[in-house]
Structures are given as C-alpha cells and as structure tokens.
C-alpha cells in the first residue's frame, strides 16, 4: 500500500474553535452517522462557519481507496487492486456551478461512435465518502439543491443524457451554510436537511478577545499552533471513530420512541423525517459518549437541532422555534 501526499494549506484545529457548540455537535454527529442527513448552518457573517466545517473534515481519518479511481471507491477483495490512502474528501460547491459540473457529463459523441460510456465525473463523484460543503446554499438554484439532497439521501448519483444512463456511488455528508439576511431556503428543501444549527456572533467581550488572539497566533505560526492542539485532536478523532464502530449496537427504548413521535405530532411536523432523524441523532450522541443505550439527556441534546426547521412558521408567533421544541420536550419527557 502506498500513500498519496498533497501539500495542503494549514487548517485551524477543530478543538481550538471557541464556542459555537451547537454547530460543532451537529457536524460531529453527522460524521458519526451520515444517515442523519446532513446539516444546515445559518448564522451571521464571520461567525466561523466555513472554518469549523473545514476543521471537522481535517479531523477525520484517512480513507483507503483504489488507486486512480475517480469515485473514491473503497477497496474490494480483488487482490490485484493497488490501494492508496487519501484524506477524507472535503469538496466545496461553488455558487455558479452548473448541473453538469455537479453531476458529471457523458460524452455522447464518443458513446455513439466508439460504443463506450465516456463519463467525466462531477463534484458528487469527488465528494463520495467525504463531505460536500455548499456555502450560501440559500442562494443556490433550487434545482441543484434538489439534486444534492436526492444524492445525499440515496447515496447514488444518476446521470442520463440522450438515452444513456450512468450511476455511481455518492455517499457524503451534505453541509450547507448561509446568512438568513440573504434569504431563507424553501421549507420543503430545508425539511430535507437532517439538522439545522443556528449560530450567532459572540457577544461576550472577553470571549471575542480570546477568539481574535487565537486566530492571530494561528496565522503567525500555524505549525506551532496545530502542534499545541495535536493531542486534543487525536483524542477527539479516536472518540469519533469509536462512536462510528459502536453506533450499530446502540438501542433506544420504545417509550422514548413514542415520546419523540408525540413531540413531533404535537408540533404538527409534516411527514416522519423529524421522528427518524431524532432517533438517529440520539443514538449517535449516545455512541459519542460511549453508551449503548439512549438516555433522556441524549434526546434533549439533539431534539432542537433535528426539529426546529420543520415547524410551520406563524408570523404572529413571538416564541423562537427552538425554544418551542425545547419547551414541549420538557412537558412530554418530564
């Protein structure tokens, strides 16, 4: 086995990020169980959204892939395959991307003349087994958001042109971020994100000074700063890998399942996505804390992240949707 080495710019350590616990938790849980369905992060400009997302990708272990494979395919039992290790893919989707750039293109002329399927992979192929990040997803064309969500949910990307069809694996954690001042995502699209984290600018002056100082020190000497947090980074990486291995053994009681569904029902949440995601996220949080049984505290920690964006908006209502979820949780679970 050989290792592919690339020169990458230094990434700010995930464990060095101050505050924004809600966003960090949502990202960690999605990495533990990608079937949660990704996370939408909404918040003010300059609150560390992009920095945190790149930091979680940098924290993930290397993955084994077949050499020169365009889809990051995992090794099979074929002994003739040459295997290499690469960093977990972290793909940025630019706002101006076309459908062909995202999904890939089929060379129709080559297919007709040579009788072979000539496929040029897109960003979904590159993101397979990694993270696909869309900044300002609320400004992205709805049609493209639909494609991303469909692929993230099914784990497959299908490209069809002139009667020729190609399908490949596209399993990735979809992370979207945006500023609410620039417009909201349509409710039917927002509902398809597993979690919704809301982040705000730090108001505490002492905390603000700490953030500024830490970023300044990192920019002056990135290597020294990364070494300072290496031990904490390795500990968190080990914890995430352990949770990934443990999650299949985690159980949730029928009573808790019933109460989660009761919360969703009383909040008038459309469909069953809210129920499913809350169950999954609670299991992931239990696994993250090295437990095989879900406790009330696990559900309390994740339920707002899983449900706040699924509530119908009433313009006359003054209570925040997150507070509404938390209040009902306390009534039903106490």
UniProtKB/Swiss-Prot annotation:
EC assignment: 6.6.1.1
Organism: Olisthodiscus luteus
Gene name of this polypeptide: chlI
One GO term (biological process): chlorophyll biosynthetic process
Entry-linked Pfam families: AAA_lid_2 (PF17863), Mg_chelatase (PF01078)
Catalytic activity: protoporphyrin IX + Mg(2+) + ATP + H2O = Mg-protoporphyrin IX + ADP + phosphate + 3 H(+)
Keywords, ordered alphabetically: ATP-binding, Chlorophyll biosynthesis, Chloroplast, Ligase, Nucleotide-binding, Photosynthesis, Plastid
Protein name: Magnesium-chelatase subunit ChlI
A GO CC term attached to the entry: chloroplast
Taxonomic classification: Eukaryota, Sar, Stramenopiles, Ochrophyta, Olisthodiscophyceae
């Amino acid at each position: 086995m050989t290792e592919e080495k690339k020169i990458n710019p230094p990434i700010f350590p995930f464990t060095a990020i101050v505050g924004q616990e809600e966003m960090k938790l949502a990202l960690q849980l999605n990495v533990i169980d990608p079937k949660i369905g990704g996370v939408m992060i909404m918040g003010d400009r300059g609150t560390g959204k992009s920095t945190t997302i790149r930091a979680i990708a940098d924290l993930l272990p290397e993955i084994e892939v077949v050499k020169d494979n365009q889809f990051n395919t995992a090794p099979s039992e074929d002994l003739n395959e040459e295997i290499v290790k690469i960093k977990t893919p972290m793909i940025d989707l630019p706002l101006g991307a076309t459908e062909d750039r995202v999904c890939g293109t089929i060379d129709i002329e080559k297919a007709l003349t040579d009788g072979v399927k000539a496929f040029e992979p897109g960003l979904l192929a590159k993101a397979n087994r990694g993270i696909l990040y869309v900044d300002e997803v609320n400004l992205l064309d709805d049609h493209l958001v639909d494609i991303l969500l469909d692929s993230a949910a099914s784990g497959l990307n299908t490209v069809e042109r002139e009667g020729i069809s190609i399908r490949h694996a596209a399993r990735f954690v979809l992370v979207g971020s945006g500023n609410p001042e620039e417009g909201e995502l349509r409710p039917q699209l927002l509902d398809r994100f597993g979690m919704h984290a809301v982040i705000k600018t730090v108001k505490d002056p002492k905390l603000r000074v700490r953030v500024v100082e830490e970023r300044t020190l990192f920019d002056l000497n990135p290597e020294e700063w990364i070494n300072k947090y290496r031990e904490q980074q390795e500990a968190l990486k080990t914890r995430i890998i352990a949770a990934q291995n443990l999650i299949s053994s985690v159980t949730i009681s029928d009573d808790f399942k019933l109460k989660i569904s009761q919360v969703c029902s009383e909040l008038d949440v459309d469909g069953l996505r809210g129920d499913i995601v809350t169950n999954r996220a609670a299991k992931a949080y239990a696994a993250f804390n090295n437990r095989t049984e879900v406790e009330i505290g696990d559900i309390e920690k994740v339920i707002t992240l899983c449900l706040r964006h699924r509530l119908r908006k009433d313009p006359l209502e003054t209570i925040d949707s997150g507070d509404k979820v938390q209040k009902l949780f306390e009534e039903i679970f106490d």
